[in-house]
A protein has these predicted regions:
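N-terminal cap/lid segment of alpha/beta-hydrolase-fold proteins
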Residues: 2-39
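Active-site glycine-rich loops that stabilize anionic/oxyanionic intermediates
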Residues: 44, 49-55
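Conserved alpha/beta-hydrolase
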Residues: 57-89
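Alpha/beta-hydrolase active-site loop
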Residues: 94-115
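Alpha/beta-hydrolase-fold enzymes
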Residues: 124-211
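Short beta-strand/loop motif that positions the catalytic acidic residue
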Residues: 227, 233-235
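Short alpha-helix in the alpha/beta-hydrolase fold that links the catalytic acid
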Residues: 229, 242-253
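Catalytic active-site module of serine/aspartate enzymes centered on a nucleophile-bearing elbow/loop
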Residues: 264-314
Length: 314
């Protein structure tokens, strides 16, 4: 097992990737970006980055460039209704969490297999993006999976000291405003991107099982069990969404995968705060990004990795 100290801090290129459009199975056009090396290599892994709910793919550009600098091909993209994939009007635009995984992420897998034939496919999923990784019909093609704060927002799993505040914000106020506007106007509130009503309905439904969320009820079966990727779930101890219970709830669906849950406290890396979003901030390139990088490269944790294992190799 190698050490995290073996990873040099490489300069991250300033390019934003090559823009592309990809059409889903139901005919929707998605926008995204691709970092591709000039010299083809059938053994070079491709990483698809699945964003958190209503977070633009541009948020992950620096992390994508970091992976590219370490030899990966990388795809980032926006789910339907978000960023590069936003429609002309958000009012009553139809999209759901299940659409984001079963149609949008699936379209990226199809693109990967078409343009990078035979190359290993890995995924990094942030928040709901980790859940989306298990919803695509072709998810059995994944080699390795890294999730960060990945869960599907069951309110009782929120951190006890902020549970009722989060419940009021995301499970009362958000759906109420969505009924008024026909979508959630997150941008004008400064909370997140504007969000389709169907996604809000999935998020705010207070059910402990994903199959009980509105958009999942029509699924004949859940594709999660098809995933056999070697999986690392990273959680942060000061993330009020990504509690141990929340992370383990989602991990339980990936029953055919070898799963490890690494929990990191800010103090483990001499920081006072990390939270739900900051893992992908470039200031954490030297201390957090190598954890994901090593897993993508080797399928295991490096010696000296900060944090503690909650469920190693479950």
């Amino acid at each position: 097992m190698s050490s995290l100290e073996a990873f040099p801090v490489l300069p991250v290129a300033s390019n934003s990737g090559q823009a592309f459009r990809e059409t889903t199975a139901d005919g929707y056009s998605l926008g995204g970006f691709c970092w591709r090396h000039q010299v083809p290599d059938a053994t070079r892994p491709l990483v698809i980055i699945n964003a958190a709910t209503s977070v633009r793919c541009s948020y992950y550009a620096r992390f994508a460039q970091y992976l590219f600098a370490h030899g990966f091909e990388v795809i980032t993209y926006d789910y339907r209704g978000i960023g590069e994939s936003r429609p002309a009007s958000m009012r009553h635009f139809k999209a759901s969490w299940t659409d984001w995984g079963a149609l949008d992420f699936e379209a990226m897998l199809q693109r990967a297999q078409r343009l990078f034939p035979g190359q290993p496919i890995d995924v990094v999923g942030h928040s709901f993006g980790g859940c989306a990784a298990g919803l695509a019909p072709s998810a059995d093609q994944l080699r390795r999976l890294v999730t960060v704060g990945a869960q599907f927002a069951y309110w009782r799993d929120y951190a006890a000291d902020s549970r009722w505040q989060l419940f009021g914000k995301w499970h009362v106020l958000m759906p109420l405003l969505t009924r008024v506007f026909g979508y959630f106007p997150g941008k004008r509130l400064g909370w997140l991107e504007d969000t389709p009503a169907g996604v809000v309905q999935d998020w705010s439904t207070p059910s402990a099982a994903y199959e009980q969320r509105p958009s999942a009820r029509a699924l004949v079966d859940l594709p999660f069990a098809r995933v056999r990727a070697r999986t690392l779930a990273i959680s942060l101890s000061d993330d009020p969404f990504g509690t141990v219970a929340a992370i383990e709830r989602l991990l339980g669906y990936f029953e055919a995968s070898e799963r490890s849950h690494l929990r990191i406290a800010p103090g483990d890396i001499d920081e006072s705060r990390i939270g739900h979003f900051a893992f992908f901030h470039s200031r954490f390139q030297p201390r957090l990004w190598p954890i994901a990088l090593h897993w993508l490269q080797q399928g295991q944790l490096a010696e000296g990795t900060p944090g503690r294992l909650i469920s190693p190799g479950a």
